[in-house]
């Protein structure tokens, strides 16, 4: 691989981060549920500092926050893809959107339970 090919690969690699950032920003700007989860994450982080979480607890919290944001992004991508494919109400389109929303809901509930297990003993 010559120097020019290496630069092109590196350029494409960095551009992928730009595209990812745009996707995150657009979702954060337009999706109400993502905004709710961002506010909840801020509240959890503040509470974590106040109760002085251990390093393991911080790791768990960051995994849960990252997982929640990731699932919200995937849910949004699925919703947009379904909307692009059809503007008609179709049972399969509804099933795809509902399943994606269900995945977010399951992770949110489990995250809340784990959060309670971490925070309640510290109160």
UniProtKB/Swiss-Prot annotation:
Membrane-related topology note: Multi-pass membrane protein
Pfam families referenced in this protein's UniProt entry, alphabetically: DAGK_prokar
Gene3D superfamilies: 1.10.287.3610
UniProt keyword list: ATP-binding, Cell membrane, Kinase, Lipid biosynthesis, Lipid metabolism, Membrane, Nucleotide-binding, Phospholipid biosynthesis, Phospholipid metabolism, Sporulation, Transferase, Transmembrane, Transmembrane helix
Top-level taxonomy: Bacteria, Bacillati, Bacillota, Bacilli, Bacillales
Name this protein carries in UniProt: Undecaprenol kinase
Keyword DNA repair tagged: no
Induction or repression: Mainly expressed during the vegetative phase of growth.
Record PROSITE patterns: DAGK_PROKAR
Main location: membrane
UniProt record, GO biological process: phospholipid biosynthetic process; sporulation resulting in formation of a cellular spore
Record topology, Cytoplasmic segments: 1-33, 75-99
Molecular function GO labels: ATP binding; di-trans, poly-cis-undecaprenol kinase activity; lipid kinase activity
Native species: Bacillus subtilis (strain 168)
Ranges in the topological domain labelled Extracellular: 52-57, 121-123
Entry's localization field: Cell membrane
Chain's role: Catalyzes the phosphorylation of undecaprenol in vitro, which is probably the physiological substrate. Exhibits no detectable activity against other substrates such as monoacylglycerol, ceramide, or diacylglycerol (DAG). Appears indispensable for the maintenance of spore stability and viability in B.subtilis.
Any GO CC annotation of this UniProt entry: plasma membrane
Disruption phenotype: Cells lacking this gene exhibit an abnormal cortex structure in mutant endospores 6 hours after the onset of sporulation, an indication of cortex degeneration. In addition, they display a significant decrease in the dipicolinic acid content of mutant spores.
Family, as annotated: Belongs to the bacterial diacylglycerol kinase family.
TM helices/strands, residue ranges: 34-51, 58-74, 100-120
EC numbers for this chain: 2.7.1.66
Catalytic activity field: di-trans,octa-cis-undecaprenol + ATP = di-trans,octa-cis-undecaprenyl phosphate + ADP + H(+)
């Amino acid at each position: 691989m010559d120097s020019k090919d290496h630069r092109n690969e590196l350029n494409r690699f960095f551009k992928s981060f730009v595209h990812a950032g745009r996707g995150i920003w657009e979702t954060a700007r337009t999706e109400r549920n993502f905004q709710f989860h961002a506010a909840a994450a801020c509240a959890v982080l503040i509470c974590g500092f106040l109760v002085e979480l251990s390093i393991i607890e911080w790791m768990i919290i960051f995994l849960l926050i990252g997982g929640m944001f990731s699932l919200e992004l995937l849910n949004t991508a699925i919703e947009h893809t379904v909307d692009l494919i059809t503007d008609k109400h179709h049972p399969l389109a509804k099933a795809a959107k509902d399943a994606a929303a269900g995945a977010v809901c399951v992770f949110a509930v489990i995250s809340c339970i784990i959060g309670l297990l971490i925070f309640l003993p510290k109160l």
